[in-house]
From Swiss-Prot:
Its EC number is 7.1.1.-. It comes from Vesicomyosocius okutanii subsp. Calyptogena okutanii (strain HA). NDH-1 is composed of 14 different subunits. Subunits NuoA, H, J, K, L, M, N constitute the membrane sector of the complex. It holds the Pfam family NADHdh. The chain crosses the membrane at residues 22-42, 94-114, 130-150, 164-184, 199-219, 254-274, 294-314, 333-353. Belongs to the complex I subunit 1 family. This is NADH-quinone oxidoreductase subunit H. It is found in: Cell inner membrane. PANTHER family: NADH DEHYDROGENASE SUBUNIT 1, NADH-UBIQUINONE OXIDOREDUCTASE CHAIN 1.
Length: 357
């Protein structure tokens, strides 16, 4: 909160004629821009990292032509997509066709408003920030469903139907998985959940909730349409799914939304199960002092990078699951395990097993 108060004072000093409400709106707007620009850069270079990592896993070099070692490849890709023509299918509903990418990208950006990067670095600190993330994050699928419907083509429609079914299935699993975290932390505030895990790696929730952490990670792959669960846009089955009729910047917007959601799920995994911005060496006498100079945000970024690498590793090593296998995994495997683990956590809470309860 000290950083927030300092920021407020700076704005009032620069523009003293602003009243309190306008100043707060201006501050939130500035913080939103400060978050949006780095997020788009991270998304752009995550695509570069993906191509490089998967290339090395397949004994290839990956992008290496544009700029030194291919570092300018994301910029070249962006310019290419910006200059491509946007083609509208003959029988498409043009208004809904253009609205769909907006519905996909808007929630993917809006949900970052409540994500804390450190104890005092966030846009807003909602008491119900976890519920906000679940509510806003689930809206993005309507963009995919609308894209499938508005394209007036059979392959996008099949992709939209799959997307709707997967949303219903895995939103329930993710919701039940996060209930266990809320039961231990006693709050739905993301900041409070992270603070409850301070004290070192032994206090992090991935230890008592290890099966739930695995389920959450796999479910996040499904929710973000990532391989091996990318049946919504399976090229070998439905050509490209909901994206097949999109081109140029309309396609790029869907692309940005998918990768922004991937980064979001990686950050959520860190916040929920791996102590957020806390160092793993807290309360360890010698190591705590050695690593005390590293800011909390750096720890958060390092843990998030690890999960983002896991996304790439899974994509490069596992074949695509069939649609019926994914549904079976949700309803007959993950859902029963999460329900059972809720009762296990309730029992451990009553027994007050230290150090988590």
């Amino acid at each position: 909160m000290e950083l927030w108060q300092t920021f407020v004072k700076m704005v009032h000093a620069l523009v003293p004629w602003l009243d309190g409400t306008v100043a707060i709106i201006l501050i939130i707007f500035i913080k939103a821009i400060a978050l949006l620009i780095p997020l788009m850069l991270v998304v752009a270079y995550f695509t570069y990292a993906e191509r490089k990592v998967i290339g090395y896993m397949q004994l290839r070099i990956g992008p290496n032509r544009v700029g030194p070692k291919g570092w300018l490849q994301p910029i070249a890709d962006a310019l290419k997509l910006m200059t491509k023509e946007i083609i509208f299918p003959t029988k498409a509903n043009i208004y809904l066709f253009l609205l769909a990418p907006v519905l996909a990208i808007a929630p993917a950006i809006a949900v970052w408003a409540v994500i804390p990067f450190d104890e005092s670095i966030y846009i807003t600190n909602l008491d119900i920030s976890l519920l906000y993330v679940l509510a806003i994050g689930s809206i993005g699928v309507y963009g995919i469903i609308l894209a499938g419907w508005a394209s007036n083509s059979k392959y996008p429609l099949l992709g939209a139907l799959r997307s709707a079914a997967l949303l219903v299935s895995y939103e329930i699993v993710i919701g039940f998985a996060l209930v266990t975290v809320v039961m231990i932390a006693g709050s739905v505030n993301l900041n409070t959940i992270v603070q409850a895990q301070q004290g070192g790696i032994i206090y992090w929730y991935f230890i008592p909730l290890f099966p739930i952490m695995i389920i959450f990670f796999i479910s996040s792959l499904v929710e973000t349409n990532r391989a091996p669960f990318d049946v919504v846009e399976g090229e070998s089955e439905i050509v490209g799914g909901t994206h097949v009729e999109y081109s140029g910047m309309t396609f790029a917007v869907f692309f940005l939304a998918e990768y922004a959601n991937m980064i979001l799920m990686a950050v959520l995994s860190v916040i929920m199960f791996f102590g957020g911005w806390h160092s793993p060496f807290e309360a360890i006498p010698y190591l705590e002092s050695v690593f005390s100079w590293i800011p909390g945000m750096i720890w958060l970024l390092a843990k998030t990078t690890f999960f983002m690498f896991l996304y790439l590793w899974v994509r490069a090593t596992f074949p695509r699951f069939r649609y019926d296998q994914i549904m079976h995994l949700s309803w007959k495997v993950f859902l029963p395990i999460t329900i059972i683990w809720i009762f296990v956590v309730a029992l451990m809470t009553q027994l007050q097993l230290s150090p988590w309860f």
